[in-house]
Amino acid sequence: MNAPLQGHTASNLHTTTPLLAVDNVSLEYRTPERVVRATHQVSFEIDPADRYVLLGPSGCGKSTLLKSIAGFIKPCEGEIRLLGQKVEQPGPDRIVVFQEFDQLPPWKTVKQNVMFPLLASKTLGRREAEERALHYLAKVGLAAFADAYPHTLSGGMKARVAIARALAMQPKILLMDEPFAALDALTRRKMQEELLLLWEEVRFTLLFVTHSIEEALVVGNRILLLSPHPGRVRAEVGSHQFDLHSLGGAAFQQTAQRIHRLLFDEDSEEGARAAAELGFHDIRIAY
């Protein structure tokens, strides 16, 4: 990437209906002792080709929210809509990539792993599924490993297979739950770069979960900041001006520090001051 990728923000979009709308969603789960609220009245919208990041500390409900968008958990309050239709169950229009890449069946080759959901869902016949699998393996740089087995791949290569498998289904939105968290720092940076290059070529819609401020600024063009448990919306900021080349720069570091203050400062006045210092035109604050 020779220049920052110019994503779009809410301020310059002209669509009337968002691709995904999360409207006042609260989520709960049960423990042996009690019912725990994971998120409280969270709202946001995602438009086509957005790289939207859910950012917050561990335990703030990011992953729970992602699973609810995928259709695995029903909100106890509010609703989630995809293209105006209420989300009530899982579907091939929302594909999830987790950080555990051992989700790849070890007895299937790389190509067979990518083909599997296409065949299982009867989306395509075998010949068409093979063609599409090879197409997306080429996109992620693994065409030469189509006949390899998962145990022969590195962690980064397994991540690429998981991404190729997800994109081969051509979902309306790709959901990624801290997909690079288990990788070493160098591989993680490489995967971030490859994800952005792939987005530049394919322009898929991405919802990305992370607890890393730096990763959020690099990957996203918009970031939703969630408070510590239970997750509430602290702010939404635009971040399309940053990319991997911004790491270590003064503006990048200052923005990361101010986002940290927004996430963790319980004083609403201090949080509002940090938001003002960010200088983004499309920032939204909620306390």
Predicted regions and their residues:
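ABC-type ATPase nucleotide-binding domains, specifically the catalytic core motifs of the NBD
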Residues: R30-P32, K74, M115-E128, K139-V140
